[in-house]
């Protein structure tokens, strides 16, 4: 479960029957990406608003879509992708602390879309599932459990 400021990883045994290990990482979250990009933008005297950073992250695969001056585009593109790769590396290290060779990986949380490709590549033998509506999946599942009784 990758959120803004935290990553929670659980290892579940059997047929999703029992949690065997859980670990929370309070310094791994999407804020890593936003902070890295913000520092770069500030050093280049560019817009550091969250809305602008969100635009850059959303368009990180298409350099031409970045709303930035042509002479700054390459640097911004590289900074954005470097920040995302930093997050991906930290998440992979954290997950392997809990489970080195998972059979299934369920991606939950608003930051899941930033790590999905790297998780699929690193855990290539695992079945990687991006849950529907990952940002709200956990809260919706809790609500469903409470109100279905």
For the regions a language model picked out, list residue spans one by one:
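Gly/Thr-rich phosphate-binding beta-strand-loop-beta motif of the actin/hexokinase/Hsp70
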Residues: 1-16, 37
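Short helix/strand-bridging catalytic loops that position acidic/His residues to coordinate divalent metals
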Residues: 15-28, 125-128
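Conserved acidic E/D residue at the C-terminus of a beta-strand in Rossmann-like folds
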Residues: 1, 24, 132-133
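Aspartyl protease active-site motif detector
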Residues: 3, 27, 31
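Helical "lid/coupling" subdomains associated with nucleotide-phosphate turnover
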Residues: 11, 32-46, 50-149
